[in-house]
């Protein structure tokens, strides 16, 4: 069984400006943010069966409402051309970032899911490609990917 665990860092916006609304309903933003030492852990495991998401926080949905589910499904659709949810993966969330607190926990979890699946599925997508996919989920997703990628390159 192959698995990858990644820290999923919270962030705080020091300055946030909404520049306009895009055709997809999301906003164009200008922001200055700071990553925090507070993080969730996202573990993605390859195993047989349907997509399963588990979470130690009972108030977090573990179905298609979860941004992690949406990230896995979007990557699957984008690279494999399939509209069905991906199979043969389990995603476990260990939450430390308070939900709905404006700290970007869900976006960061989605970003780490994209990074982990890129490795596990051996897609070899570069960060720019992953960022474009992540941007379809929300403006904070690519920022989380970029920050974590920078941290990993320092290790």
Predicted features and spans:
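Short conserved loop adjoining the S-adenosyl-L-methionine
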Residues: 143
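A broad detector of short, well-ordered amphipathic alpha-helices
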Residues: 69-70, 111, 132
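Short, well-structured alpha-helical segments that form the helix of a local strand-helix-strand
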Residues: 126-137
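Single conserved hydrophobic/aromatic residue that forms the stacking wall/gate
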Residues: 146-155
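Short, small-residue alpha-helix embedded
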Residues: 107-120
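ATP-binding N-lobe of GHMP and related small-molecule kinases
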Residues: 1-101, 119, 123, 127-128
């Amino acid at each position: 069984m192959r698995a990858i665990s990644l820290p999923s860092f919270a962030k705080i916006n020091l300055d946030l400006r909404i520049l306009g609304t895009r055709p997809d309903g999301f906003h164009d933003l200008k922001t200055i943010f700071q990553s925090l030492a507070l993080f969730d852990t996202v573990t993605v495991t390859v195993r047989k069966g349907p997509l399963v998401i588990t979470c130690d926080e009972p108030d977090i949905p573990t179905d298609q409402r979860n941004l992690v589910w949406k990230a896995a499904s979007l990557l699957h659709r984008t690279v494999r051309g399939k509209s069905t949810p991906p199979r043969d993966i389990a995603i476990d969330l260990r939450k430390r970032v308070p939900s709905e607190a404006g700290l970007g926990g869900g976006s960061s979890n989605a970003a780490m899911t994209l990074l982990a699946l890129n490795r596990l599925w051996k897609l070899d997508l570069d960060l720019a490609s992953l960022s474009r996919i992540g941007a379809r989920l929300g403006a904070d997703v690519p920022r989380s990917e970029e920050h974590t990628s920078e941290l990993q390159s320092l290790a």
